[in-house]
């Protein structure tokens, strides 16, 4: 079992980054991650505006898988996700789906007995998922806050323990990074956050040689998802419609 700590993190996925860990195909890796605010918000007096964009969405990595080549696919099995003792949620009037209708605030959400204690009256069963996970793109540096065909900030709530993600390999070694774990998240981020939390993620990585994919695929056990990220909705629809 290999491990990589959260101090080995990046804010972009890039073909030019040096790997922080080398593993073999079939190896298991324990990946420790910061929350999406780089663990800088610890109480409700600290607001998102004090964090700075240079600390948002850190991903631990890159992890190079020896033998992975462009045109291969990287199979990433999510074996387990263990989260910290408290999650952080923030709102800001300039961000999200409700601009101008919310104030800038922070909510610290304790995690107790497998539930997120949002308030005295509201508890939500946790379902930890990985928000940012991807390989290095072939020719450009892409911020970890953006999703593309290599993965990235897909914020797909089905990327949970027990699921398997298939990612395109575009550089030698694949250079996998992951982070932005949520204790729980809905179908999207209305306020540009879920229950953001530090975590320890265990994965198994396997190279599927000569089996290219045009975009990420996820096998949840119950369904298979093609994940497309485009600026325009219809472009995303076309991308997943022509993957055969």
Regions found by a protein language model. Give the residues of each.
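Intrinsically disordered, low-complexity linker/loop segments enriched in Gly/Pro
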Residues: 80-161, 166
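N-terminal, Lys/Arg-enriched amphipathic/low-complexity engagement segments
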Residues: 2-46, 51
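Conserved small/polar residues in nucleotide/adenosyl-binding loops
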Residues: 243-244
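Conserved mixed alpha/beta catalytic, RNA-binding, or beta-rich assembly cores of soluble enzyme
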Residues: 130, 143-148, 157, 163-235
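Short, structured beta-strand/loop micro-motifs enriched in basic residues and often containing a Trp
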Residues: 5-14, 53-59, 142-150
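Short, Lys/Arg- and Gly-enriched loop/turn segments at beta-strand edges
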Residues: 36-46, 81-90, 173-183
């Amino acid at each position: 079992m290999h491990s990589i700590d959260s101090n080995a993190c990046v804010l972009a996925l890039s073909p030019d980054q040096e790997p922080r860990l080398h593993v073999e195909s079939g190896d298991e890796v324990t990946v420790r991650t910061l929350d999406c605010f780089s663990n800088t918000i610890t109480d409700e007096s600290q607001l998102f505006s004090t964090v700075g964009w240079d600390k948002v969405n850190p991903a631990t990595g890159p992890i190079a898988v020896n033998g992975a080549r462009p045109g291969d696919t990287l199979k990433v099995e999510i074996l387990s996700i263990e989260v910290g003792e408290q999650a952080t949620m923030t709102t800001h009037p300039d961000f999200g789906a409700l601009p101008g209708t919310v104030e800038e605030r922070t909510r610290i959400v304790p995690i107790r007995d497998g539930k997120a204690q949002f308030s005295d009256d509201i508890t939500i069963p946790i379902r930890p998922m990985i928000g940012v996970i991807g390989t290095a793109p072939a020719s450009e540096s892409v911020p970890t806050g953006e999703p593309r065909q290599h993965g990235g900030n897909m914020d797909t709530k089905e990327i949970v323990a027990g699921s398997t993600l298939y990612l395109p390999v575009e550089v030698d070694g694949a250079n996998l990074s992951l982070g932005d774990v949520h204790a729980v998240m809905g179908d999207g981020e209305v306020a540009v956050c879920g229950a953001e939390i530090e975590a320890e993620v265990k994965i198994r990585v396997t190279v599927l040689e000569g089996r290219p994919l045009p975009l990420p695929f996820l096998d949840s056990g119950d369904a298979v998802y093609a994940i497309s990220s485009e600026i325009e909705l219809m472009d995303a629809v076309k991308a997943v419609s022509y993957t055969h």
